[in-house]
């Protein structure tokens, strides 16, 4: 009996020692950096495993990206993308109908404005990320900068993973939004949900914002994680299995370019246009051709063929 108990205890101890290896990985990304330095500095005072996403055209973008990097935090570009709903948009918001050159220009500008960025995630973007051809243009641009894409999943049928196929861009997906509600109790519920998903699936990504309520909850909870949960940077999950739940678009054709004459009113003719019949068309065409300079020239040449010049006639008669 005693040897059996010793074996059970030894097995339990082995499991306890191996638990860090089997720990669930939790990545937390805080979006919308660049507008509220006071709140954002509080986030930067937390463990460096928390990643931050900076809006590229925000007033403090470069400052906060540099601070985050110097504090050991991973920096992403929080790239504005067009939503389906009508709402105020950030400068340089990506839209599906933009050309590849325009999208590349915006991403290049964002990279310049947010130093030390290693990835990009979308700010809003339900319209953009659900458009396969628009996202293919995004992925082609990202590949040039060796950036990964964190899909914020603002719409169920996001095409990000499908669009990245054939490129070197790695895509990971958000699983939990921490603060759709800014009530602290609700944020705690979402934080615990992220922990449960990390435990169940091996890893998960939660996204929040530097709201005062979110900052307070993070300050309480990130220092009291369960022993089987490890806080990690978002990029450490790039090799974790990802499931593409999207469906291909029904009509897989690119968006038509914008018609520059759309909305322009055409003037109505004062008189009805007279019909042009075929016989009259050919008469006019024949007259036009016969009076052309080239035809007249050939006519003169043709009339002169076979006729000897006057000087030649005189010489011939003299001989």
Curated annotation (Swiss-Prot):
Keywords for this protein: Signal
Q: Which InterPro entries match?
A: Divergent_DAC, Glyco_hydro/deAcase_b/a-brl
What's the name of the protein?
Uncharacterized protein YibQ
Organism of this sequence = Escherichia coli (strain K12)
Q: Which residues form the signal peptide?
A: 1-23
**Gene3D superfamilies on file:** Glycoside hydrolase/deacetylase
Q: Does the keyword Transferase apply?
A: no
Keyword presence, tRNA processing? no
One GO term (biological process): carbohydrate metabolic process
């Amino acid at each position: 009996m005693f040897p059996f108990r010793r074996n059970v205890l030894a097995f339990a101890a082995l499991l306890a020692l191996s638990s860090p290896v089997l720990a669930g990985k939790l990545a937390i990304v805080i979006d919308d950096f660049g507008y509220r330095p006071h709140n954002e500095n509080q986030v930067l005072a937390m463990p460096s495993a928390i990643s931050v996403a900076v809006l590229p055209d925000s007033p403090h973008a470069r400052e906060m990206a540099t601070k985050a990097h110097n504090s050991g935090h991973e920096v992403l570009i929080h790239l504005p993308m067009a939503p389906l709903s009508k709402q105020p948009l950030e400068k340089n918001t990506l839209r599906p109908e933009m050309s590849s050159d325009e999208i590349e220009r915006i991403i290049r500008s964002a990279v310049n404005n947010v130093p030390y960025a290693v990835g990009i995630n979308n700010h809003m973007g339900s319209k953009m990320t659900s458009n396969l051809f628009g996202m293919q243009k995004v992925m082609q641009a990202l590949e040039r900068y060796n950036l990964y894409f964190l899909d914020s999943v603002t719409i169920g049928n996001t095409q990000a993973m499908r669009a990245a196929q054939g490129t070197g861009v790695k895509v990971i997906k958000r699983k939990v939004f921490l603060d759709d509600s800014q009530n602290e109790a609700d944020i705690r519920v979402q934080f615990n949900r992220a922990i449960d998903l990390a435990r169940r699936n091996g890893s998960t990504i939660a996204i929040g914002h530097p709201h005062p309520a979110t900052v307070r909850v993070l300050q309480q909870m990130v220092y009291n994680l369960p022993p089987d949960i490890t806080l990690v940077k978002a990029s450490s999950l790039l090799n974790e299995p990802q499931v593409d739940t999207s469906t291909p678009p029904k009509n897989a054709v690119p968006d038509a370019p914008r018609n520059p004459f759309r909305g322009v009113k055409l003037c109505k003719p004062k008189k009805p246009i007279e019909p042009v019949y075929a016989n009259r068309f050919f008469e006019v065409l024949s007259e036009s051709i016969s009076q052309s300079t080239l035809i007249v020239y050939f006519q003169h040449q043709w009339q002169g063929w076979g006729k000897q010049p006057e000087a030649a006639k005189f010489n011939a008669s003299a001989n």
